[in-house]
Amino acid sequence: MNLMSWLTIPTSITISTIMVTSSTHWIMAWTCLEINTLSMIPMISKPNHPRATEAATKYFLTQTLASMTMLFAATMNALTTSHWEITLLTDYTAITLMTMALMMKIGAAPFHFWLPEVSQGATTMTSLTILTWQKLAPMAILLTLSNKINQTILLTMAILSITMGGLGGLNQTQMRKLMAFSSIAHTGWILSTMALAPNISALTLSIYIMTTTPIFMMLHFTSTSTIKDLGMMWTISPQLTSILTMTILSLGGLPPLTGFMPKWLILNKMVMFNLMTEAALMAVMSLLSLYIYLRLTYISSMTLTPHINTTTMKWRMNYKTQPLTSSTLMILAILMLPITPKL
């Protein structure tokens, strides 16, 4: 792929996402989402491998189905209300269809079937883009419609996403697929308070992106693709490996790390609205994900994988490629809990 393509594709992805978040018209938002989808396909299929081609095909078909449903819902609402504004979505059937379409775009259960396979077929940094940046545009629309979406639907999908994210990641050995199930579980936490407190949902999404990004950057810089490779990451950068351990625990929501902040705020808000049963169920189901993160921590920092004495020891990363950005994000992903009372 030539230089012009690599300049055009990231620019299209960035601008289309920004335009969706600032759009007030359904046709404009739908068009930008389509541009965003079409820009991602060359990035996914870039390795020129059958698995990458399969991932790009699955991504295209799923996103196209979601876009068709989204356009159908917007048209149905326009026929009823004679308006195309996003904030004037009032038809109940259109709201339900729009919710389903947006859930499919972000990979929430039970529409999560495509996300692990696409993440595994793409490269590490492309998978990072799918699991973080590509969620911004649909989430922005969901936050705009948060006061119109049925709370029962959101809570049902939230609990189902947390459960499926935990169960799906239990038997995984591939890091990208495991992080995809982690994304599904965190999507459930984001959806849980979207109708109650959209600002907490936005905070949860921000902290998830801030925590996931350095993990993927470390996987990319150390060429780690499986859990077995994670056990030898210390030979490349012992310091960053120790910080990575704390970042993984933060992703699991273990106090006193940053990842505990959104879960604390979400459960507190749900208890305030007398949703004790749902809050308890979410907390119990999140233990499945926490077990996965503890297993990663144990493998990366608390044990040494079997290896022969002639194993090549890299000892240090090349300082020219030292991921300083990931180091900064790791620190933020670990130490931001004390600012919670200020939020």
Q: Model-predicted segments: where are they?
A:
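Core, highly hydrophobic multi-pass alpha-helical transmembrane subunits of bioenergetic inner membranes
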Residues: 1-343
